[in-house]
Design a protein with these regions (language model features):
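Extracytoplasmic Ser/Thr/Pro-rich, glycosylation-prone low-complexity segments
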Residues: 1-191
Length: 191
């Protein structure tokens, strides 16, 4: 599979005002919404014309292990797959069954050149308001390249799974071990 590009320049793609908000039923089990792509996205020898956006900070296809809300190390057949993990943690965006601690929204915008999924100031599930916010986005290109941009990340940064894996959970890249911080404000990586 691809490797991470070193010395990546931070490049936020602003979709505010043009993105469509996703409306999740809840923030845990099966909390994904499907987004159609106007192009085929190649990923591990398959091509997809959609992405499933999960409220817990990852995107994927085919919904294998979609109900997993607790992150862990990859590659692993017990984790969601195939998937790209931008910041997979137990996140708590606004949803139809929101608790008082839910905050932030998830938007997407697609065109022929790229697809963007934006986690806009989403909080981590803690049961407490004010636990920090995560402002990051996925960008997918028709070539199969993908990147994650992190605009402003506040709160717990060392508990997320970040990387990608194939549909069997047998191949993938974990960019950081859970327990270590990897992302920071105005940071990007691409594969």
């Amino acid at each position: 599979t691809s490797s991470v590009e070193p010395d990546m320049n931070y490049e936020w793609i602003d979709i505010e005002g043009q993105g469509t908000m996703l409306n999740f039923e809840n923030n845990d089990s099966f909390s994904s919404e499907s987004v159609s792509l106007p192009f085929e996205f190649p990923f591990f020898n398959e091509s997809y014309t959609y992405i499933n956006v999960n409220a817990n900070g990852w995107i994927g296809w085919e919904s294998e292990n979609e109900s997993v809300w607790q992150n862990g190390s990859i590659p692993s057949s017990s984790m969601p797959r195939p998937a790209i993990f931008g910041f997979f943690d137990d996140l708590n965006p606004e949803n139809q069954n929101s608790t008082a601690s839910a905050s932030g929204n998830i938007f997407y915008h697609v065109n022929d050149d790229r697809a963007v999924v934006w986690f806009d100031d989403v909080v981590r599930w803690t049961g407490e308001a004010g636990s920090g916010t995560y402002d990051f986005q996925f960008v997918l290109y028709p070539s199969g390249r993908f990147r994650c941009n992190y605009r402003e990340m506040e709160g717990t940064l060392d508990q997320a799974t970040i990387g990608w894996q194939n549909d069997a959970g047998s191949q993938g890249t974990e960019l950081v071990d859970v327990g270590e911080a990897f992302v920071f404000n105005e940071f990007s990586w691409e594969a």
